[in-house]
Amino acid sequence: MPEPVAEPALNGLRLNLRIVSIVMFNFASYLTIGLPLAVLPGYVHDAMGFSAFWAGLIISLQYFATLLSRPHAGRYADVLGPKKIVVFGLCGCFLSGFGYLLADIASAWPMISLLLLGLGRVILGIGQSFAGTGSTLWGVGVVGSLHIGRVISWNGIVTYGAMAMGAPLGVLCYAWGGLQGLALTVMGVALLAILLALPRPSVKANKGKPLPFRAVLGRVWLYGMALALASAGFGVIATFITLFYDAKGWDGAAFALTLFSVAFVGTRLLFPNGINRLGGLNVAMICFGVEIIGLLLVGTAAMPWMAKIGVLLTGMGFSLVFPALGVVAVKAVPPQNQGAALATYTVFMDMSLGVTGPLAGLVMTWAGVPVIYLAAAGLVAMALLLTWRLKKRPPSALPEAASSS
């Protein structure tokens, strides 16, 4: 974890601008993810002639690479400092675009072209994990650990913004210049971000002795489990709300997803100091309660307006879960291990979103679409119970106490 630079307290607009000036590098990394997201599946299936399996695999490779590389990103950020990790990650984003460019050049040889696309996706996954983890820690190093919740919140906001912008922009780039035009756009975004990052002052890495990975995992896994359980609600909304609306014979699934995103971002903007004022565990429990109500409304909805209110509440509830639990998880380890703690904690969300889709699909096939929202509400209720138990544990039994001993 970087050591924050000693300077006067930051407040309000100045604080937010300071944070945004760093998390914009995470925005750039997610923009390089969003740009090809709506293009590559169709390109692999229609233009290259491969099956839907290969089209899906090309997209999934990035997520697997992110999942496997994230703990290493946190560890290296603790040792080398977050700025170097961000630049390294952005270089990976640049190389992913170069991989797409080579795939376009090799389009006469479909297997080679597919291999180059897959390589680009793997490099992108590694780059995103490093740029995302590093930008959070860099932001904390700039504004101080008191504002870690706000830094994490802003990272989520720019992530959603980049993905929302990237997909339609990528379609336009592909329509304009084919895969080559898309690749050059990805490379241009990453290169611009690298050039903006290099002159920025770095923050010092903490020189303390790092804990082994197993020790870090032991101190954050309960918070990660609560996050994983709560992420199921987000997963079933994002993946299956369209099928839910189709099963009901309703229109407006896209608007429901828009409501979720607006609620997610709006809640983070409206309550930037909620975690500092109430505490991470308290905020998480409130959020779980709101998310449960939202999922129950969706699962039992008899009218479209009920489902839309449910989706809105689910977005509001899930919005602050990650930063609220993340603040507590990061403080459960010494400063020199907080990068590893943040990365390890994030892995639980990655894994949850990875398994929610197929498991919910099996449940949906067996019991119908609405049941998955009721099941997700049950999982979030388990997260609420787990967090309540964590709050009730005596201080001597909490990971934070152990980390300071």
UniProtKB/Swiss-Prot annotation:
Keywords: Cell inner membrane, Cell membrane, Membrane, Transmembrane, Transmembrane helix, Transport. Pfam families: MFS_1. CDD domains: MFS_YfcJ_like. The keyword Lipoprotein does not apply. It is found in: Cell inner membrane. It is a multi-pass membrane protein. Its main location: membrane. One of its GO terms (molecular function) is transmembrane transporter activity. The chain crosses the membrane at residues 19-39, 48-68, 85-105, 106-126, 129-149, 156-176, 178-198, 224-244, 252-272, 283-303, 309-329, 344-364, 366-386. InterPro entries: MFS (IPR011701), MFS_dom (IPR020846), MFS_trans_sf (IPR036259), MFS_Transporters (IPR050171), MFS_YhhS-like (IPR023008). PROSITE patterns: MFS (PS50850). One of its GO terms (cellular component) is plasma membrane. SUPFAM superfamilies: MFS general substrate transporter. PANTHER family: MAJOR FACILITATOR SUPERFAMILY MFS_1, RESISTANCE PROTEIN MDTM, PUTATIVE-RELATED-RELATED. Belongs to the major facilitator superfamily. YhhS family. This is Uncharacterized MFS-type transporter YhhS.
